């Protein structure tokens, strides 16, 4: 598998027995190692005889693994080619490394990207949900009409701001603040991405939730108050249960925007394709990875297919 090939060339696997073969040491050969075996005179002018020498070395050295262009193998029938252009489901979903340009074997582990996406989305929801519901309740049940008519258009306007603007705001304001507050070497982190996504999700959550609460019949509110309930008891026991379907819709729409956001996250999370251990570390999300790499991946190749599966 690509992971095993990488481990062989990283010298983490040093014997064929570890791969289910004979008890034979693995000898790794790269093209740049050829000068350790042959002199310039033996290789000829412009490395004219390099192919013959590499083929000779591969044929006579037991347990060797060579990473060289195929054109240098003069007698292909005399060697065994290792195919690394296939991606197994296990390597993809259980792989802990995403390194599509690695040689000799690219790594397409989804785990760092899935983990990064879950970290950012979860914390964005934790930040946005309490604040969004609080503002919705205030606008629907507490604020006077003058304040509501002034505040509602501003919140709706925020949902139309391009994500790159939120990204610049996060890069200029939130990232330096996090770096200073937590004494970090860099401020680009999952926390910065979560805060930016929470800000972006708030207009959707507030608008949809507030509309759902305002649809609660006035008679239900008055009946609750007539029975002696306070305003907050009425909100908690009557308005919110009646509006729960609309509140859920607003939360789901806000979460959907948080999970699928690309540009703002790409700008503030650090884009490190590693499994984060805390929210203060740089990470990379699935949408950001697809946006950053799809344009450079050869169509139909393993990298392209991995990104397609990732989406």
Question: Where do the protein language model's features map onto the residues?
Answer:
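Periplasmic/extracellular loop-to-transmembrane helix junction in inner-membrane transport proteins
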Residues: 81-124, 144, 292-303
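Membrane-interfacial helix termini and adjacent extracytoplasmic/periplasmic loops
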Residues: 90-108, 166-200, 269-272
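Hydrophobic transmembrane alpha-helices
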Residues: 154-161, 174, 194-205, 255-262, ...
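Interhelical loop and adjacent transmembrane-helix boundary motif
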Residues: 266-311
């Amino acid at each position: 598998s690509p992971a095993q090939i990488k481990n062989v060339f990283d010298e983490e696997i040093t014997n064929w027995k570890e791969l289910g073969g004979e008890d034979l040491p693995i000898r790794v050969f790269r093209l740049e190692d050829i000068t350790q075996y042959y002199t310039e005179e033996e290789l000829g002018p412009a490395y004219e005889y390099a192919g013959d020498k590499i083929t000779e070395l591969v044929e006579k050295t037991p347990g060797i693994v060579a990473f060289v262009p195929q054109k240098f193998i003069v007698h292909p029938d005399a060697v065994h080619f290792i195919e690394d252009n296939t991606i197994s489901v296990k390597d993809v979903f259980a792989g802990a490394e995403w390194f599509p340009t690695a040689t000799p074997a690219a790594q397409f582990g989804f785990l760092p990207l899935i983990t990064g996406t879950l970290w950012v989305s979860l914390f964005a929801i934790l930040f946005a949900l309490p604040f969004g519901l609080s503002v919705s309740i205030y606008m629907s049940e507490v604020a006077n009409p003058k304040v509501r008519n002034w505040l509602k258009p501003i919140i709706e306007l925020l949902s139309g701001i391009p994500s790159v603007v939120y990204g610049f705001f996060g890069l200029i304001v939130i990232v330096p603040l996090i770096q200073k507050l937590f004494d970090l070497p860099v401020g680009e982190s999952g926390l910065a991405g979560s805060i930016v996504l929470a800000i972006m999700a708030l207009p959707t959550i507030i608008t949809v939730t507030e509309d759902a609460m305002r649809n609660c019949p006035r008679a239900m509110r008055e009946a609750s108050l007539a029975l002696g309930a306070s305003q907050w008891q009425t909100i908690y026991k009557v308005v919110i249960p009646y509006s729960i379907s609309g509140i859920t819709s607003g939360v789901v729409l806000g979460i959907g925007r948080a999970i699928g956001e690309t540009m703002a996250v790409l700008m503030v999370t650090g884009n490190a394709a590693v499994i984060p251990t805390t929210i203060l570390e740089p990470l990379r999300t699935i949408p950001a990875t697809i946006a950053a790499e799809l344009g450079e991946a050869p169509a139909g190749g393993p990298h392209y297919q991995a990104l397609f599966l990732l989406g």
